[in-house]
Amino acid sequence: MIGCLIGEVFALEAPTVLLNVNGVGYEIDTPLSTFCQLQKGQKVTLWTHLVVREDAQQLYGFSDAQEKTIFRTLLKVNGVGPKMALGILSTLNVELLVHTIEHDDVNTLVKVPGVGKKTAERLMIELRDRFKTLAQGTSSAAALPQIQFVSNSPVAEAEAALQSLGYKPLEAQKAVAAVKADYTESADIIRAALKSMMK
């Protein structure tokens, strides 16, 4: 099992990070809360979870051990796979997710792409007790550092990131169009678009 990887960020394409670890490039899918903290050339430690399926192996990476623990906890819920768990962590930061579960806020959870009412209710029931211990000491991911994107425009990067979370192309375009005039960086556009879609 690969518990964490320490290396240099070689490339970024939301939500995937290519991490150079001693000459070996690892493709790691990350929640946007982690992705938005990374810059090309930066040396980082990513806490990882490896998912092995019959047809593929996929690494998921997180900026801290707590986010990894929550990802693994989400995977234990019936009907929640890695893509949905990543979408939940990308849409709601750790603090907001714990608050949402504690307060039975189904309406917030159903705004996550792919999470319907039944899944949201199941998440509430199965995670309530597990998240009580996480309620203390969670930190908000609201103030994330800027990110440098290599290839596309900030608008295109933001739209691609939202689509990778499961939003339809038209939804992503509308959300980005509504906020793009106020921001120049992709990470800021992504955060603002997600916030507007959660209203």
From Swiss-Prot:
Annotated segments matching region Domain III: 150-199
Keywords: Cytoplasm, DNA damage, DNA recombination, DNA repair, DNA-binding
GO terms for biological process, alphabetical: DNA recombination; DNA repair
Protein localization: Cytoplasm
Keyword DNA-binding: yes
Predominant location: cytoplasm
Gene3D superfamilies with a match to the protein in the record: 5' to 3' exonuclease, C-terminal subdomain, DNA helicase RuvA subunit, C-terminal domain, Nucleic acid-binding proteins
Region (Domain I): 1-63
A GO-annotated cellular component: Holliday junction helicase complex
Pfam families for the chain: HHH_5, RuvA_C, RuvA_N
One Gene Ontology molecular-function label: four-way junction helicase activity
Lineage: superkingdom: Bacteria
Segments crossing the lipid bilayer: none
Cystine connections: none
InterPro entries associated with the record: DNA_helicase_Holl-junc_RuvA_I, Hlx-hairpin-Hlx_DNA-bd_motif, NA-bd_OB-fold, RuvA, RuvA_2-like, RuvA_C, RuvA_C_sf
Annotated region (Domain II), positions in chain: 64-142
Domain remarks in the Swiss-Prot or TrEMBL record: Has three domains with a flexible linker between the domains II and III and assumes an 'L' shape. Domain III is highly mobile and contacts RuvB.
Assembly description: Homotetramer. Forms an RuvA(8)-RuvB(12)-Holliday junction (HJ) complex. HJ DNA is sandwiched between 2 RuvA tetramers; dsDNA enters through RuvA and exits via RuvB. An RuvB hexamer assembles on each DNA strand where it exits the tetramer. Each RuvB hexamer is contacted by two RuvA subunits (via domain III) on 2 adjacent RuvB subunits; this complex drives branch migration. In the full resolvosome a probable DNA-RuvA(4)-RuvB(12)-RuvC(2) complex forms which resolves the HJ.
Protein function: The RuvA-RuvB-RuvC complex processes Holliday junction (HJ) DNA during genetic recombination and DNA repair, while the RuvA-RuvB complex plays an important role in the rescue of blocked DNA replication forks via replication fork reversal (RFR). RuvA specifically binds to HJ cruciform DNA, conferring on it an open structure. The RuvB hexamer acts as an ATP-dependent pump, pulling dsDNA into and through the RuvAB complex. HJ branch migration allows RuvC to scan DNA until it finds its consensus sequence, where it cleaves and resolves the cruciform DNA.
Name this polypeptide is given: Holliday junction branch migration complex subunit RuvA
Annotated source species: Acinetobacter baumannii (strain ACICU)
Lineage: Bacteria, Pseudomonadati, Pseudomonadota, Gammaproteobacteria, Moraxellales
